[in-house]
Amino acid sequence: MAMRTHYCGLVTQALMGQTVTLAGWVNRRRDHGGVIFIDLRDREGHVQVVCDPEREQMFKTAEGLRSEFCVQVTGLVRARPDGSSNDRIKSGQIEVLCHALNVLNPSVTPAFQIDEENLSETTRLTHRVLDLRRPYMQRNLMLRYKVAMQVRNFLDANGFIDIETPMLTKSTPEGARDYLVPSRVHDGQFFALPQSPQLFKQLLMVAGFDRYYQITKCFRDEDLRADRQPEFTQIDIETSFMQEQDIRDLFQDMIETVFRNTLGVDLGEFPVMTYQDATSRYGSDKPDLRVKLEFTELTGVMKDVDFKVFSGAAGMKGGRVVGLRVPGGARDAGGLSRGEIDAYTEFVKIYGAKGLAYIKVNARARGRDGLQSPIVKNLHDAALTEILARTGAQDGDLIFFGADKEKIVNDAIGALRTKIGHSEFGKKNGLFEERWAALWVVDFPMFEFDEQAQRYSAMHHPFTAPKDGHEDWMASAPEKCISKGYDMVLNGWEMGGGSVRIHRADVQQKVFDALQITPEEARLKFGFLLDALQYGAPPHGGMAFGLDRIVTLMTGAESIRDVIAFPKTQRAQCLLTQAPSPVDEKQLRELHIRLRNPDAAKAH
């Protein structure tokens, strides 16, 4: 006999008058006038079970129930009494009159009630098994499953083959740090956990599989943020014999299908924006287009002003000066307060800005006299006129300024733009539009200059193909080279990124030369790829999407940890299992490892 006939949350009026057997957990037990009510919960939801004292043995068992007891119930589905229905749940019109009650397993007192909301993340992650029983987490993980299934169905229908690639691979220290795995068999040598299956999926294209995908774990030993984990799940895809536009069209169709079939959402238009345009207008290569604020370019205007912060930035190599007009920010009633401006000043310092200059436009028609700011006296009339003209500022508006190296300005004022847009002020004043805002960012630079190392590094990775003809600039002017790279952005988050790959060994060698990777180093790190490219490698390209990020966006979760069953903390720890943890001396000896600071391991 089956342990249950139905899920709790799926018992509805359609089963009225039928006997059902349910299994789940006691969410609440309530005593009312000699009758016991049990809210029974499973992954599909709740159902109300009524225990009548007429069945003495069953009722006695019900009296001993506590929260989180695992029980089996057999009973009759009937309508709830008039006035007691609950429209918030699927089973809210019915209840189950209990005939038999079996305790499958009692529970100790839980660390918290499952429906408790104000829990610290430490408590939730330490008691993750209980946390995962909460309907919020169950919904998130069920949605994650549905997204993965939609992706698989779409790719299968389009001829993609699911192929696994190695988890123990070669360390290639480019970009983020690798997680290393010592080899017991090969003394002093290490595997690395993959940061991406990038090279293997390219090899699969050379091998002729034509269309590949996998939903796989990737690992990066980097500082964590709200949208990062040391291990994360990637929807990894590669295809041969497709142009860049065709690849983008295919994957846009995939994401549109996933959102439509799981959320019933139409993502609408996907505008295409160049990297240069995105960073120029929004200070970011993943702009949140729901925020209705844009940069105003002022570098040329500020070169001869007396305010050294502006003229210095405008005159330096790689410097930039921008304005950010905030409509209504200077109004006496409902504008930004002095405290808010001070808070924003501190905020931009996180991104390297030294301060945050501003001008309040009180009465534009009065010219200089209608402007309020400590910096106005250091700006000549022509500069002030140009600022007002370019920003389009009106009475009651406030203009923030960023002046520094271009990267600092873009990062600081770009983050400020997003913060203001998402603030209470921004939403009240129509600076934020509640919608799904997707776009493609294309034409990324091939290289970016690393000031510390004093050499170029790859913007995406060194296997990204340049725009046709741009390989000729790699030796003489690498900063001019544009790649066939592209990112899909949604609501200010990079959902996925990819590129057309280099499929010719001679072009790959030019990229290595531009990155100052010697032939010997290239052969040592990537010899297997260089060899493969010589065997008639096809034109190919692809993308990788962050499954964790997609589901986080869909659920509106505050943290990516809310859509992962067993995540790590921001200190890369698992509070449930207490990983990482010390290992015993015998294991270390087998791996030929001696700790340089054994006391540090004991201290943790």
Swiss-Prot record:
Residues at the site labelled Important for tRNA non-discrimination: H32, G83
Name under which the protein is recorded: Aspartate--tRNA(Asp/Asn) ligase
Subunit structure: Homodimer.
Binding-site positions, ATP: R220, D221, E222, Q229, E494, G546, L547, D548, R549
Organism: Verminephrobacter eiseniae (strain EF01-2)
GO molecular function: aspartate-tRNA ligase activity; aspartate-tRNA(Asn) ligase activity; ATP binding; nucleic acid binding
Known role: Aspartyl-tRNA synthetase with relaxed tRNA specificity since it is able to aspartylate not only its cognate tRNA(Asp) but also tRNA(Asn). Reaction proceeds in two steps: L-aspartate is first activated by ATP to form Asp-AMP and then transferred to the acceptor end of tRNA(Asp/Asn).
The reaction(s) this protein catalyses: tRNA(Asx) + L-aspartate + ATP = L-aspartyl-tRNA(Asx) + AMP + diphosphate
Pfam families: GAD, tRNA-synt_2, tRNA_anti-codon
Region annotation (Aspartate) ranges: 198-201
UniProt enzyme class: ligase
Main localization, broad class: cytoplasm
Keywords, ordered alphabetically: Aminoacyl-tRNA synthetase, ATP-binding, Cytoplasm, Ligase, Nucleotide-binding, Protein biosynthesis
SUPFAM superfamilies, per database record: Class II aaRS and biotin synthetases (SSF55681), GAD domain-like (SSF55261), Nucleic acid-binding proteins (SSF50249)
Domain of life of the native organism: Bacteria
GO cellular component terms, A-Z: cytoplasm
Any single biological process term in GO: aspartyl-tRNA aminoacylation
Intracellular or extracellular location(s): Cytoplasm
Cited InterPro entries: Aa-tRNA-synt_II, aa-tRNA-synth_II, aa-tRNA-synth_II/BPL/LPL, Asp-tRNA-ligase_1, Asp-tRNA-ligase_1_N, Asp/Asn-tRNA-synth_IIb, AspRS_core, GAD-like_sf
PROSITE patterns: AA_TRNA_LIGASE_II (PS50862)
Residues reported to bind L-aspartate: E174, R220, H460, R501
Family to which the UniProt record says this protein belongs: Belongs to the class-II aminoacyl-tRNA synthetase family. Type 1 subfamily.
EC number: 6.1.1.23
Membrane-crossing segments per the record: none
